[in-house]
Amino acid sequence: MAGINLNKKLWRIPQQGMVRGVCAGIANYFDVPVKLVRILVVLSIFFGLALFTLVAYIILSFALDPMPDNMAFGEQLPSSSELLDEVDRELAASETRLREMERYVTSDTFTLRSRFRQL
């Protein structure tokens, strides 16, 4: 159980759900089995939280967007560390290109070619 992943969005997953997909979306968000969430919902209904559970379920069923079909169940957005690693690689590649250009501009070859062009 990984807990809350701040990079995930809470969706309704009607493809995996029994009623509107709210329990499946919550299970995907918290990275727990769907059956566990469904059992907790049923237990909360039987142990005195029926009104709260039903109202929350109805509100979530209308408030949450359905998961797009192109996103697979369990698929997640890249984490912030992965995004930072990708940006770091791009910046390193840009720095390498900049150093190569700087080396060429400050070289004798560049000076010689620019003087030939001026003739």
UniProtKB/Swiss-Prot annotation:
Record the organism: Escherichia coli (strain K12)
Topology class, membrane? Single-pass membrane protein
A GO term (biological process) for this protein?
positive regulation of macromolecule biosynthetic process
Cross-referenced Pfam families, in alphabetical order?
Answer: PspC (PF04024)
Q: How does it assemble?
A: Interacts with PspA.
Query: For this UniProt entry, which segments traverse the membrane?
Result: 39-59
Q: Principal localization?
A: membrane
InterPro entries, alphabetized: Phageshock_PspC, Phageshock_PspC_N, PspC
What cellular component terms from Gene Ontology apply here? Answer: plasma membrane
Q: Tell me where it resides.
A: Cell inner membrane
List UniProt keywords, sorted A-Z. Answer: Activator, Cell inner membrane, Cell membrane, Membrane, Stress response, Transcription, Transcription regulation, Transmembrane, Transmembrane helix
Instruction: Please describe what this protein does.
Output: The phage shock protein (psp) operon (pspABCDE) may play a significant role in the competition for survival under nutrient- or energy-limited conditions. PspC is involved in transcription regulation.
Q: Into which family does the record put it? A: Belongs to the phageshock PspC family.
**Which protein, by its recorded name, is this?**
Phage shock protein C
Up-regulation conditions:
By heat, ethanol, osmotic shock and infection by filamentous bacteriophages.
